[in-house]
Amino acid sequence: MNFSIPTFVWTIINFLLLLVVLSYFLFKPVNEIIDKRSKDIEGDIEQARIDKDKAEELRIANEEEYKAAKKEGKIIVENYKAKAENVSEEIISDAHKEAEIIIERAKKEIQREREKAEYEIKNKTIELSLELSKKALERSIDEKMHRELIEEFISKVGN
């Protein structure tokens, strides 16, 4: 093979021209696309980092709200428990008062019934005594008859 300098120079010039044309039409647009894609990826990464930070802030805020709501719920439950205990104590107190009133009424009723029974017994005793005296005066009584009358009187008083 022959080496010719003019061919070699023309080949180098052609190669350089091809490089310039390729650089202008191929390498430059490809580099621009790659640069644009790199910037897009960096932007996406930065946006993802920002979104992650926001999500973390929201998670913390939600966690704090949850804790506050849980604490508030606990306070509400405790308040209702206290109110329920107060109502329960009030109901029990009212029931005790009502029971005392009923017991007092029952005692008064028993006392009235007792007084009534005593009055009736007293009247019955007087009646029986008068009847016994009447019978005693109507007959002449010996000791045996007197004992029978007393036993009859006691049995009537017992009934």
Swiss-Prot record:
GO CC terms in record: plasma membrane; proton-transporting ATP synthase complex
Molecular function GO labels: proton-transporting ATP synthase activity, rotational mechanism; proton-transporting ATPase activity, rotational mechanism
Name this protein carries in UniProt: ATP synthase subunit b
Chief location of this protein within or outside the cell: membrane
Membership in a protein family: Belongs to the ATPase B chain family.
UniProt keyword terms in alphabetical order: ATP synthesis, Cell membrane, CF(0), Hydrogen ion transport, Ion transport, Membrane, Transmembrane, Transmembrane helix, Transport
HAMAP family: ATP_synth_b_bprime
Role description: F(1)F(0) ATP synthase produces ATP from ADP in the presence of a proton or sodium gradient. F-type ATPases consist of two structural domains, F(1) containing the extramembraneous catalytic core and F(0) containing the membrane proton channel, linked together by a central stalk and a peripheral stalk. During catalysis, ATP synthesis in the catalytic domain of F(1) is coupled via a rotary mechanism of the central stalk subunits to proton translocation. Component of the F(0) channel, it forms part of the peripheral stalk, linking F(1) to F(0).
Spans traversing the lipid bilayer: 7-27
NCBIfam families: ATP_synt_b, PRK13461.1
Bilayer topology term: Single-pass membrane protein
Keyword Acetylation: no
Highest taxon of source: Bacteria
Compartment(s) where it occurs, according to its Swiss-Prot or TrEMBL record: Cell membrane
Assembly with partners or alone: F-type ATPases have 2 components, F(1) - the catalytic core - and F(0) - the membrane proton channel. F(1) has five subunits: alpha(3), beta(3), gamma(1), delta(1), epsilon(1). F(0) has three main subunits: a(1), b(2) and c(10-14). The alpha and beta chains form an alternating ring which encloses part of the gamma chain. F(1) is attached to F(0) by a central stalk formed by the gamma and epsilon chains, while a peripheral stalk is formed by the delta and b chains.
